[in-house]
Amino acid sequence: MNNFLVKVASTIEKFNMANKSERLLVCLSGGADSVTLLLCLYELGYDVCACHVNHHLRGEESDRDQHFCEKLCEKLGVELKVFHADVVGYCKEHSVSTEEGARKLRYDFFDSIGADKICTAHSLSDCLETAIFNLARGTGLKGICGIPPVRGNIIRPLINCTRQEIEGFLKERGQDFVTDSTNLTDDYTRNKICLLYTSDAAD
């Protein structure tokens, strides 16, 4: 078994995340992290299905991501459920930010599917970003701890994996993924902090 797969399998076992009798829902955006998560759980023999949320916030790019996920799941023979979210309308009605509204709609959709576990592709790199984000907001020690491996029925099998390891896994398999252009801008607070940190770390 590939070293990366061993690491993911060990994380699942260490935190008692899931067993082979459970139905696991992979939240699939088409990005490197979620594609890796789907492939890992599939190759490890878990009963997986996937879901994709088209937020319709990035024009053709949103549709590109959806089509990519559809083709990937078709190739693997994995069931995919697609949800079209009216983020703009929801945010206007409930007076919340785009990020907050999109997140609420996503998780409501995930819950509605009724899988045993919801699998998100948060990585060790995301934990670092979250800790920096929380520090910047002035939160205490709890905030610095970042993202928990398990929260209720939500599990994060890639939580001990770095972005470099994830991209290496995909490169080894010749597996493509999509890139969200908003991750390359500073339109959102989290992205802005991440870009600033990455820029500082590279100096």
Model-derived features with residue positions:
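Conserved small/polar residues in nucleotide/adenosyl-binding loops
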Residues: 197-203
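Core alpha/beta nucleotide-donor-binding catalytic domains of modification enzymes
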Residues: 1-195
